[in-house]
Amino acid sequence: MAMPTNHAILSASSSHRWLECPPSAKLCAELPDTSSEYAQEGTDAHALCEHRLKALLGRETTDPTENLTYYNEEMERCAVEYATYAYEQVKKAKVACNDPIVLIEQKLDFSRWVPEGFGTGDCVIVADGTLSVIDFKYGKGVEVRAENNPQMMLYALGALELFDGIYDISAVNMIIFQPRRDNISEYAISKEELLRWANEILTPTAQLAANGDGDFKAGKHCRFCKVRATCRKLAEYNLALARYDFEPPATLDNIEIAAILAKADELVSWVTDVKEYALRQALSGVSYDGFKVVEGRSNRKYTDENEVVEAVKSAGYDPYEHSVLGITAMTSLLGKKKFNELLGGLIEKPQGKPTLVSISDKRPAIHTANEDFKEEK
């Protein structure tokens, strides 16, 4: 979804949070929105996707690239991949329906279930019996899944509001297209299942959230919450690990270590957020017992690189480093096709450094030395 400039209190993009923790919605609404480079980059990518898809469909469109701050070859490639994929979905829809409806960047109103609820669907395809909603995600930090994704389900409800009376829709397809994670995630649900969820779970929870009622609940949904640094429930949730009732003996057993690992990343992230929040507050005049603000370490830098170059050259030395461009920079220089032609046979991908992750991670487990030894025996 493109980043809207005006947010509803109960937005689709934050629904994963307020459905789990209803009172967080009003608390977050009281704080100002803060933009980031990642958010602006995503906005640029969505604008380019819209243009590329409209062009494929033969619709009137204006190339936005000269106005995109973060436009680069990777963004272009991702936009073309998205447009091509969405266009293929349109062609599939035409097999079942001669003239499917295709909406791009369509405002979707789901306020029948969520007070003032609306969002923007990147691509909505409506054909006889089937509604498809495609959402483009440019982020690469977290892989987004379509299965039981509340944001996608809200978009689907908004699309049903527009078209269910015109088309006899019975099935809903929800698709996440996330090219920088090589992730295309699909989830199909019947209209009846979607409406049952909307009436039995969504509506009552949304009403609680709109009123600031309900119980606070900490969990993975807290990751992008605006009040996570000062939330008491999240603090209790994370500090519970510090109060873990470790039993003798003096060393932890595997079960205790697994319990710590399950929360370690969230704990580290939360502590970082608290420290950043405290620094901002301290810089604005807040005092914390036992702490003070000091000047951090800094590195020396040249005041004028051009003068440095001239001075070093005049002394008879070469001021520049000389090394082969890295793979990403070389791909940008040559283009992906030329890069593969010239250097495809000279590229290898060594094994990655072993890392311990949750069992839910999609990557296959590697064989440890101990397992190999057991197999040999």
List PLM regions with ranges.
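Mg2+/Mn2+-dependent nuclease catalytic core
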Residues: 40, 98-207
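Metal-dependent nuclease catalytic cores that hydrolyze phosphodiester bonds in DNA/RNA
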Residues: 1-131, 171-173, 264
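Charge-rich, acidic-biased intrinsically disordered regions
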Residues: 65-74, 221, 228, 279-306
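Alpha-helix N-cap/helix-initiation motif
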Residues: 34, 38, 143-145, 253
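Charged, polyampholytic interaction/assembly segments that form long, compositionally biased interfaces
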Residues: 286-377
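Contiguous, amphipathic alpha-helical segments that mediate oligomerization or scaffolding
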Residues: 243-298
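Hydrophobic/aromatic-lined pockets within catalytic cores
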Residues: 53-57, 138-141, 156-164, 207-210, ...
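Short, charged, low-complexity amphipathic alpha-helix
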Residues: 173, 199-265, 370-377
